[in-house]
Amino acid sequence: LIADCLRIIGLCRLAYRMASKVHTSTSSVKNKFWSTHVSGMALQYSGDMIGAEKAFLKSQDFACELSLSFSLQHFGKLNVEVGNYKLAEQQFIEALAIREKLKRADLVESTNRAIRGLQKLRT
């Protein structure tokens, strides 16, 4: 949580370092997912898209189904940023399917907004 707050206020490198330390020091699979996921977001916001991609992929190794939907959606946003719209759409659709299956209406709407935004970019 602290690492994500650091990312939000613009201290992305510090957020990445803190999340990495959490990842290496925890035995909790849930904490490994979130620390790696936050690392991906911090790297993305600092402009390191390759590092972010690796972190998002690695986070999926520790993801439960709901967490996987977060990883897919954020990874999809990264792919929108780099212009890989086809892969982003696939990731959004996969995240949407998980969220619909889990009956998470709040998250379904978030993913639908991401899909609509991508559609606007394509037109």
What are these regions (language model features)?
Residues A19, H23-T26, S59, A63, ...:
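Eukaryotic all-alpha helical interaction scaffolds
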